[in-house]
Swiss-Prot record:
Signal peptide: none annotated. Belongs to the MCM family. Disulfide bonds: none annotated. This is Uncharacterized MCM-type protein MJ1489. InterPro entries: MCM, MCM_4, MCM_CS, MCM_dom, MCM_lid, MCM_OB, NA-bd_OB-fold, P-loop_NTPase.
Length: 682
């Protein structure tokens, strides 16, 4: 049998003999398994090669992999015969595609799954199967597939099957020497699309190496613009240099399957046993959170929140399961280390807004010359689309007004709509966002609203479930601990004994080795759980929301966030029910977060509007001054500053406060100042 692409361990028998031996058997298989295709007269029939292999046609599948075009033509012959036995006629223009190679044929000699980086000259003309993430997709264009010609000189009609590489197909010449004319109404066209795919990082032999790409040609494409795909196709060579015999390798796809995007991780019985063993510990969440980012000292609340973000809440119709987190950090805290560490989890991606354009977050539609030489519109999915089903780790997050609506849609509905250049598509962006940025003035100021300190619009800011300011506050004892940890960290990389003492690479708990690989497997296993909220947990959530609404200015968004966090906490402990413990933990995380960013010391309450730049107290004062100007404007179109100040003083508003309030009313577009010191309503 074939143990890897292009390496045959057994001598193939005569091709015609192999085909004739399986003809009746294959015809019977197609008549039984693809009976629905025949009855419905489907134009495209997809044959599952793994199923065919298990059916007993091992030698034919091996033949097809080494001779894909001849093998598919033979399947088509047998399908036509099967079709005839059921319908007493032959099909017209049926297209045969194949998918799902048996495992033995998509494993390399090294024992790893076949990937883009394994496509070499030895695989040319063979059948291969690999996964990729779409990084560019052209618009759909018609491609001539079956051409009907007529000779204007002798009247002879000619029919030709057109291959994707036959660029001279429309300049066919008759035997008499005259150039043939294409008969448009008879000729058959198919939908053609060109995509470029990147090898997923989780399938890279060395994730530190630059990612590998390959161009794929799709025929009969429904229009695929983003996501993770599995391609079954034939590597072909395309000459690029006119002077040298050097070629580029592309893939002619026979089948393209859009995957759900979630990375599949193989777990052994031993893995599951160890996961369940650790899950029994009361401190399991703390252990995993601390080991998730061992390079960073402290910040346990943030580590815990990020761990729960990776596990996710429970997906429900119309409700996202992903938890969005924003870190606002003073310089030198290590936000990039946190983001890059989380990006190492399969399915997650890292990107910095400083090194990518704004549309690099969402998607771009640009005109570009494709491999077939045409200048056309193409979609280039951005970070949020490529991180579908994972986490988008965004460094130096800033969002301009032009991009705001796209990112807002991605955060809330988890899709991105694109309509430009004849391309109208809805791209999936079901991902969590772990973003980080520095305060505008260098260091975070708890006295100033979050919105005023960062370049992120208020509507987007409100979509983050958790916002953590990480401040660099001088503390002698704490500074000493951090300094010692940093020095030991450098020593641990070179000294195995210190490494073990620190537990940098791994920590042994109850006989289980807790390392990066184990945590990834634990997260993947925990994600599969779907705990239901218990009555007692429900009561806690309801009471929390009602009590907080009485005293504090919070919204239903905080309740939704608490539910997602509680579900993730229950999943982290492998529970089937979200109980009181999980609800309390979620409420504590939300409350701690609000203390940092939404506590108003003047009123002693939590006010989420303070995050967005306007606290309840300030909002009341804005309303008061606006009403004063409104009342005074009934007497005069332009209201004098002195008159406003006099009335405001009666309402308890001081002069210095009034200046800021008037500036904000102008900023919000409620009033303007056509002349110095004179205002009017808008």
């Amino acid at each position: 049998m074939i143990s890897s692409y292009g390496d045959v361990d057994m001598e193939l028998r005569d091709e015609d003999l192999i085909l004739e031996e399986v003809r009746d058997y294959l015809t019977a298989y197609l008549r039984n398994i693809h009976q629905e295709d025949i009855i419905l007269d489907n134009e495209r029939v997809v044959v599952d090669l793994n199923q065919l292999y298990n059916y007993g046609l091992m030698e034919f599948v091996e033949f097809l992999i080494n001779n894909p075009q001849k093998g598919i033509d033979f399947i088509k012959e047998c399908y036509n015969d099967a079709y005839y036995t059921l319908r007493n006629e032959y099909p017209t223009n049926v297209i045969i595609a194949v998918k799902n190679l048996p495992k033995i044929f998509k494993t390399t000699r090294k024992g790893k799954i076949f990937t883009i980086e394994d496509i070499r000259s030895k695989t040319l003309g063979k059948l291969v199967e690999f996964e990729g993430i779409i990084v560019m997709a052209s618009k759909i264009r018609p491609m001539l597939k079956k051409a009907y010609y007529i000779c204007p000189k002798c009247g002879r009609e000619v029919v030709r099957e057109i291959d994707i590489l036959n660029t001279d197909s429309e300049k066919a010449v008759c035997e008499c020497g005259a150039e043939l004319n294409l008969i448009e109404h008879k000729s058959i066209y198919t939908d053609f699309q060109e995509i470029k795919v990147q090898q997923p990082l989780d399938l890279m032999e060395n994730p530190e190496e630059p990612p590998k790409y390959i161009t794929v040609f799709l025929e009969n494409s429904p229009g695929i613009y983003a996501g993770r795909v599995k391609i079954t196709g034939i590597p072909i060579k395309v000459k690029k240099s006119k002077k040298l015999p050097i070629y580029d390798i592309h893939v002619k796809a026979l089948h393209c399957e859009v995957l759900d995007g979630e990375v599949k991780i193989k777990l052994t019985n031993s893995d599951i046993e160890n996961i369940k063993k650790i899950a029994k510990r009361k401190d399991v969440v703390n252990i995993l959170a601390d080991r998730l980012i061992p390079e960073i000292k402290g910040h346990s609340a943030i580590k815990k929140a990020v761990l729960l973000q990776q596990i996710k809440g429970v997906k429900k119709p119309g409700k996202r399961a992903d938890i969005h987190i924003l870190l606002i950090t003073d310089p030198g805290i290590g936000k990039t280390v946190i983001l890059r560490k989380i990006a190492e989890i399969p399915g997650n991606l890292y990107g910095s807004v400083t090194t990518a354009t704004g549309v690099g977050l969402t998607a771009a539609v640009v005109r570009e010359k494709t491999e077939i030489g045409e200048d056309t519109w193409v979609i280039k999915p951005g970070l949020l689309v490529k991180a579908h089903k994972g986490t988008a780790c965004i460094d130096e997050l800033t969002v301009n007004k032009e991009l705001q609506s796209y990112v807002l849609e991605a955060m809330e509905s988890q899709t991105i709509h694109i309509s430009k250049g004849g391309i109208n598509a809805k791209l999936p962006a079901e991902c969590a966002i772990l973003a980080a940025c520095n305060p505008r003035w260098g260091r975070f100021n708890p006295e100033v609203s979050v919105a005023e300190q960062i370049n992120i619009p208020a509507p987007l800011l409100s979509r983050f479930d958790l916002i953590f300011p990480i401040r660099d506050v001088s503390d002698k004892d704490k500074d000493k601990d951090i300094a010692e940890y940093i020095v030991d960290l450098h020593r641990a990389y070179l000294d195995e004994k210190i490494n073990r003492e620190m537990g940098l690479d791994y920590l042994e708990v109850d006989g289980v080795k807790i390392d990066k690989e184990f945590i990834i497997k634990y997260i993947y296993y925990a994600r599969q759980k779907k705990p239901i909220i218990s009555e007692k947990a429900k009561e806690l959530f309801v009471n929390y929301y009602v009590e907080m609404r009485k005293k504090h200015q919070i919204t239903a968004r905080q309740l939704e966030a608490a539910i997602r966090i509680a579900e993730a906490h229950a999943k982290a402990k492998l529970k089937d029910v979200v109980d009181e413990e999980d609800a309390k933990e979620a409420i504590n995380i939300i409350t701690e977060c609000l203390k940092e960013i939404a506590y108003d010391p003047e009123t002693g309450i939590f006010d989420v509007d303070k995050i967005l730049g306007v606290s309840k107290k300030e909002r009341d004062k804005l309303t008061t001054v606006y009403e004063i100007i409104k009342e005074l404007s009934e007497k005069s179109e332009l209201v004098e500053h002195e008159d406003i100040a006099e009335e405001a003083k009666k309402k308890g508003i001081k002069e210095d406060e009034l200046e800021n309030i008037i500036k904000k009313l102008i900023k919000y577009g409620d009033i303007d100042e056509p002349k110095p010191g004179r205002y009017r309503l808008l």
